[in-house]
Amino acid sequence: MEFPFDVDALFPERITVLDQHLRPPARRPGTTTPARVDLQQQIMTIVDELGKASAKAQHLPAPITSALRMQSNRHVIYILKDTSARPAGKGAIIGFLKVGYKKLFVLDDREAHNEVEPLCILDFYIHESVQRHGHGRELFQHMLQKERVEPHQLAIDRPSPKLLKFLNKHYNLETTVPQVNNFVIFEGFFAHQHRPPTSSLRATRHSRAAVADPIPAAPARKLPPKRAEGDIKPYSSSDREFLKVAVEPPWPLNRAPRRATPPAHPPPRSSSLGNSPDRGPLRPFVPEQELLRSLRLCPPHPTARLLLATDPGGSPAQRRRTRGTPWGLVAQSCHYSRHGGFNTSFLGTGNQERKQGEQEAEDRSASEDRVLLLDGSGEEPTQTGAPRAQAPPPQSWTVGGDIMNARVIRNLQERRSTRPW
């Protein structure tokens, strides 16, 4: 490739190495600052043209090598110039090779992921007019010597078929290790990649470091003895008395006679409880069977026994059930056909029955008061007032000539059908 400026004056050596700064390899004596700026601009022009030619040869949509990318990455480019032909005394460029270190995640033979940072071949181009003349091998070999690497330790970024044939022909690199990215590695790549040092090498390094560093190590600080582990107590190390008290049974099993005097020694409180109120002792637990047995064996009250013995009508509940005739029963017996027509005597009879029940309740309360007085004093109180008139005998009403009480009428009403249809 030819350029309008003097390439021999810009690159005095056959192979020139440029870094990301793209500076001239050597300063000529007496070169001013504007001249140095012009030289750097010429180098940038050469790099851009080489990148375009490489992209065209590899059928890439855009060049992957340019002066701007070189300045933004820590890559190295090797430029090979033609020293035999001197057209118009300016020289020519044959090709270039761009390399750089990249952090990769690659797979080994066992398909295990490995994080490595090898030297990668990023771009390689030789002009079509001078190919198969050994210029590519010369440039590649110079790079290997400069970087001190072996061909099987390299990773190639998207190599072209021509580059793979070149590596197979000159360096016997044929078998590749399959990868999931665009890089290609060959067998032997993991032979010297991040191998951990052996114990002997590690011991040798420590001994060398001790000899190189004459400063004695600081004495080890004595640590306090480790305290023995004990039982973990809830919330604090103090005893909690209320946690040891039995749970109070539900009502009525917890009903017990209260003590007349408070306990002589109340349970102590924990110091960590603060101003929380004291919990009194729980009542003793009474089994359910003993409670039921005591209820069955409990004798009735004397007043209740006397009332049951003197009442001819049975229990008080029975008297309440049979007291008078409800208005509903009277209405039912009056309005249904099986009892005949409407009889107004039923209403009067019901009123008389209700008055009779009220009189019986008054007599019963008076008798209970008399029994209580007898139980308390042992003497029968004297009656100072006028004698109470006796209640008239209970009246009843007849149905079909038979005397029937309210209980029988109620049973009859419950057993029959109340539906009018």
From Swiss-Prot:
**Sites of Omega-N-methylarginine modification:** 323
Q: Where is this site: Crucial for catalytic activity?
A: 58
Post-translational modification as stated in the protein's UniProt record: Autoacetylation strongly increases tubulin acetylation.
Disordered as annotated region, ranges: 196-235, 252-284, 342-421
Q: Which of the residues bear the PTM N6-acetyllysine?
A: 56, 146, 233, 244
UniProt effect for mutating residue 146 to R: Strong reduction in tubulin acetylation, no effect on tubulin-binding
Phosphoserine modification, residue list = 272, 276, 315
Any one GO molecular function term: L-lysine N-acetyltransferase activity, acting on acetyl phosphate as donor
Span of domain N-acetyltransferase: 1-190
Q: Where is the composition biased (Polar residues)?
A: 342-351
So what does this one do?
Specifically acetylates 'Lys-40' in alpha-tubulin on the lumenal side of microtubules. Promotes microtubule destabilization and accelerates microtubule dynamics; this activity may be independent of acetylation activity. Acetylates alpha-tubulin with a slow enzymatic rate, due to a catalytic site that is not optimized for acetyl transfer. Enters the microtubule through each end and diffuses quickly throughout the lumen of microtubules.
Task: Note the subunit structure.
Answer: Component of the BBSome complex. Interacts with AP2 alpha-adaptins, including AP2A2, but not with AP1 gamma-adaptin (AP1G1/AP1G2); this interaction is required for efficient alpha-tubulin acetylation, hence clathrin-coated pits are sites of microtubule acetylation.
What is the designated name of this protein?
Alpha-tubulin N-acetyltransferase 1
